[in-house]
Amino acid sequence: MKLEFDPGLIEEVVFKAMKLKEESGDSAFLDEYHTFADPIYENHTPDERPAKFRKIEWDFFRKMGFYKAIEEIFLEFSGIDGLVAGGVVAKARSQFDEGSNLVKGPDLEPGKKKVVIKLLAERFHDNVFLKKLIRHELMHVVDMLTASFGYKDERLGLNPMEESIIKERYSTIWDIYVDSRLISQGKETVIDKEGRYLEFAALYHGFPSDVN
C-alpha cells in the first residue's frame, strides 16, 4: 500500500527527535541536518526553500526509522490493499482528534477510499507504543471494510451532546472488541485489561456491578 505522510507531522516528529537526542548528549543527527539545510539559504530562492526543507525532513524521517516503524505495521494488514486507495498518516490536532477513518477523494476510483490515521507527533518517540497504536487503528479499519461488521458513518444522536455520549460508549465497546482479537493473536494492546475495565465502568456506571 502506498503511504503518504503529512509534511507538518514529519517536520514536528523529526525536530522533536533531534532535540531529544541533543538533550541526551547525541547531536549527530542535528549536526548532519545542518550540513544539508544551511546551504539552502544561500543556494535557493525563498520560493524554492520550503520544498527543499521538506525533502531533507523526509530523508531524516526515514533515516531515523519512523517510516519503517509505520510500514511494518501496515504490512501486517496487506489483506486490505485491494480494498483501499492507499494510506495517509496525518497530524492530529489533539488527543481527541487521534484515530482512523476511511476518506473519499475526488481523484479516487469509484467506491475506493484512503485509510487516514491521525497521530500526535509525540507518539513517534515511543516506538513500541506507536506500533501498538497503529495496529489498533488498522484493526478498526478492517472492521470498517468488513460488510458483516455493519459499520456506517452516520449521525448517531439527536443533538451534539447525545451524539458525543453515544460515540464515546460505542468506541469503548469497539476498542474492547479490537483488544480481544489482538490478544488472541498474541499481540499487545494499547491499554491493558484493567484499563479497559475502568473505561467501561466509568461510561456505564449506571449499570449494576454484576452486569459490568
Question: What function would you assign to each model-found segment?
Answer:
Residues 2, 6-114, 185-186:
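Auxiliary, metal-adjacent structural segments of Zn-dependent hydrolase domains
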Residues 28, 37-53, 122, 126, ...:
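Alpha-helix capping and helix-coil boundary motifs
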Residues 100-105, 119-121, 138:
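Long acidic/polar interaction regions in large eukaryotic complex-forming proteins
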Residues 112-117, 158:
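Glycine-rich, often proline-containing surface loops adjacent to acidic residues and nearby aromatics
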Residues 118-133:
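Short pre-active-site segment immediately N-terminal to the catalytic Zn-binding motif
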Residues 155-212:
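Metalloprotease/metallohydrolase-associated module, dominated by Zn2+-dependent proteases
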